[in-house]
Amino acid sequence: MKFLVMIFCFLFCSISGKTQGPDEYAQTDRIALSISSSQTNNTTDIAAYINSHFDTDSKKVRAAYTWVANNIKYDAAHLHRVILNEDREEKVTWAIERKSGVCENFAAILTDICIKSGLKSYAIEGYTRGNGSVDQSGHAWCAVFVENNWYLYDPTWDVGFQENGHFTGRSGTSYFQVSPSEFIQSHMPFDPMFQFLDYPLTYEEFSKGFSKATGRKTYFNYRDSISANEKLIPLVQYEAAAKRIEKNGAPTQKVSTKLKQLKMEKEIIYQDIDADLYNSAVADYKDAIGNFKMFLNYRNNQFMPAKPVAETEATLDAILKQVADAGDKLKKVNQSKATLALNTGDVEKVLNDLSTQVKEQQVFLRNYLSTA
């Protein structure tokens, strides 16, 4: 009898647990939707609300997802104006103010809330497949690290879907916390690292409708790759992403466009670095010429008031060092990978002229001191 009771209890609990599955986040959803409108003007306040009400990663990401899916409306007027770029803050601010946006705004907001809630998260760019064909538009979604695993989230698709150039609204959680192996059946990221798969699909395999990699494949440790990527500066991240994309098989038109975008991002960074080096070199020159003029005034005043000889010699040495530092910076500019190079010729000329004049004054000073 006791044995039968145990079996009954086991079956009852199993059935009850399965029945309650859809309501697992019911309370989380209610709390997430109870946030006052005064706390939804920015993602920092939304994240603070979430952190004050939930203590697990799964509930935090659910609350963020629920809020986004229920409070950000799809902006159908901008259906064909998806701009894939790197400025997440601008995407977030624009959409939060209007409480509307397109996929990149949904992804940016969810990612921003998750990050500010203490979760590791990425907004991912790519394209999708549905009804047997690849969509011609770009798309964006999210990845969040929850309970030691990466999961994918697409709040845009749970708000509605595109079909034949039109957006049809709906509601649900079909694209909440989906496993990478399932998500790849409909979503292809430009960067294969963000498939979160040990054996990523090529772009061709995705286009042909395969749900997993075929043929002989090389193991890809995406966990280590993501960890290493987080430590890189943006320029190196772009370079690494471009290499991963180029190694992932023949690119589609959309992938080729992404590669061009990455190259443009790199070019902008190269040019920014060059501009900083150039401006710093000019600043060094201005300081050096200013110090040199003060030395000449001191000389013209018959080296009065008197200073230690070593101090006067050190002044000229310091000016030469400023000139040398400026020259080194200009050399780096000339070795730049930027397509649009800065012309350093004029600055190099005045630096060389100044260097010659300083060295002449060093000779004069030595001769002057030897006869004094």
Segments the model singles out, each with a brief description of its role:
Residues H78-V82, E90, F145-R223:
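Active-site rim recognition segments
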Residues V68, C103, A107, V323:
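Alpha-helical transition-metal enzyme core signature, strongest for iron centers
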Residues D23-Q27, Y49-I50, E163, M193-A372:
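Mixed-charge, low-complexity segments
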Residues M1-P22:
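Bacterial Sec-dependent N-terminal signal peptides
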Residues T66, F106-V178:
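Hydrophobic/aromatic-rich core segments of domains that either
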Residues Q20-R98, V102:
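Secondary-structure boundary elements
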